[in-house]
From Swiss-Prot:
Record-given protein name: Tol-Pal system protein TolB
UniProt subunit comment: The Tol-Pal system is composed of five core proteins: the inner membrane proteins TolA, TolQ and TolR, the periplasmic protein TolB and the outer membrane protein Pal. They form a network linking the inner and outer membranes and the peptidoglycan layer.
SUPFAM superfamilies: TolB, N-terminal domain, Tricorn protease N-terminal domain
Organism: Histophilus somni (strain 2336) (Haemophilus somnus)
Alphabetical list of NCBIfam families matching this protein: propeller_TolB (TIGR02800)
Length: 434
């Protein structure tokens, strides 16, 4: 399949995924709090516009923002660019390498009847590939008129992977809960691009909604609903809009987490008087209890291989993170101290958690920990599928906002909303095949 056809197909799939949703009144937007001066410099040249009117969206600006958000790159400001080439043949390598910039992205956007044709080239300016001026990566593809941002994120993914050997995650989504300032249904589960654009309402309710969690194929969300004045777990099909209640036991039902193969959901329930971890087989509805005892056990999260579950427990007097196998045996302490809301990266290398009031990363091989945030009352960390970025909620003033931090701590930003408090962010899996 040609890449242009692939990208068009991808757009149709992503659009149909959210076809049952309603576009939200306002969108979250990234506000940079801390930059990446120590990251790898790169130049994203403003793309040439081959239309008679003005370019609807600055493609180069989106690519620059994506690469900056990863914490791996520090795009040079347009005002400091020594030249503004539009093709690889126009790139003068020496003027870029003298600035310490070893890679330059150039491109063009051409409007057509169906949308836009976007072309780019990634140029090596120091000869790391063998020849200075060599094109490391290039592509040309077509996008519908309302998917130009998807085209830009696609370029970002390709450039990021070429330069880091790590798959890009700029075409992923985030789900979260918004509590609006007024209205008959102020609680909403929403989905947006990872950077806050193209926001949609998945479901609205007059009662609280909590803890959205993605299925591994990105087709469903599980979340907590307090409709009918009781907590219940819902699985929501994002394409059809169908909602299925999977747990409505007496007491609290919360913290759903899909297994890596999508066949099971781990959750916490106090149906027997004490909060414990359970696993439900989604095929036949059978439930297994994994924890027991006097302490409260909650916030289950699966290991990437699906062979173990980490969870938060106060069995020792305060919240700590433990790990057990999928039948509840072999319980071990993962992180001592006041730690909770643990998540393991997709490659199994790091644990991200709340420690005290902040986001902390723990290297699971070395045991070394690093504080990534300095915000207030941090909650609900979620890791991008490539392990490069972390999204979480924090308190700002009297409300809750989303925060983005790169896994190395270099880049920090806020995603505030203008129409309510934002909580419980959940990063999607990859939604495209490559």
């Amino acid at each position: 399949m040609k890449f242009s056809a692939y990208l068009t197909t991808l757009f149709i799939v992503l659009f149909s995924l959210f076809i049952q949703t309603v576009q939200a009144e306002s969108e979250v937007r990234i506000v940079i709090d801390e930059g990446v001066d120590s990251a790898r410099p790169i130049a994203i040249i403003p793309f040439k516009w081959n239309g008679s009117d003005s370019m609807p969206i600055d493609v180069a600006d989106i690519i620059s923002a994506d690469l900056r958000n990863s914490g791996k790159f520090n795009p040079i400001a347009v005002s400091k660019m020594p030249q503004k080439p539009t093709s690889a043949s126009e790139v003068i390598s020496d003027v870029w390498s003298s600035l310490g910039i070893d890679a330059v992205v150039v491109g063009q956007v051409t409007p057509n009847e169906k949308g836009y044709s976007i072309a780019y080239q990634l140029v090596d300016t120091i000869g790391a590939s063998g020849n200075s001026g060599e094109v490391l990566s290039q592509n040309q593809y077509a996008v519908p008129k309302n998917a130009i941002r998807l085209g830009a994120h696609t370029i970002s993914d390709e450039v990021f992977e070429k330069l880091t050997a790590i798959r890009g995650a700029f075409r992923t989504k985030i789900a979260y809960v918004v509590q609006k300032n007024g209205g008959s249904k102020p609680y909403q589960v929403r989905i947006a691009d990872y950077d806050g654009h193209n926001q949609f309402i998945v479901y609205s309710s007059s009662q609280p909604l909590m803890s959205p969690a993605w299925s591994p194929d990105g087709s469903k969300l599980a979340y907590v609903s307090f409709e009918n004045r009781k907590s219940q777990l819902i699985v929501h099909d994002l394409q059809s809009g169908a909602r299925r209640v999977i747990a409505a036991f007496p007491g609290h039902n919360g913290a759903p987490a899909f297994s890596p193969d999508g066949s099971k959901i781990a959750f916490a329930s106090s149906k027997d008087g004490v909060l414990n971890i359970y696993v439900m087989n989604l095929g036949n509805g059978t439930i297994s209890q994994l924890t027991s005892g006097a302490g409260n056990n909650t916030e289950p999260s699966w290991s990437p291989d699906g062979q173990s579950i980490i969870f938060t427990s106060d069995r020792a007097g305060g919240p700590q993170i433990y790990q057990m196998d999928v039948v509840g045996n072999g319980v071990s302490l993962v992180s001592a101290g006041r730690g909770y809301s643990g998540k393991i990266s997709a490659d199994g290398s790091i644990l991200v958690m709340i420690y005290g009031d902040n986001i902390v990363k723990k290297d699971l091989a070395t045991g070394v920990t690093e504080m990534l945030s300095s915000t207030f009352l941090d909650e609900s960390p979620s890791i991008s599928p490539n392990g490069i970025m972390i999204i979480y909620s924090s308190t700002q003033g009297l409300g809750k906002v989303l925060q983005l931090v790169s896994a190395d701590g270099r880049f920090k930003a806020r995603l505030p909303s203008s129409d309510g408090q934002i909580k419980f962010p959940a990063w999607s899996p990859y939604l495209n095949k490559n």
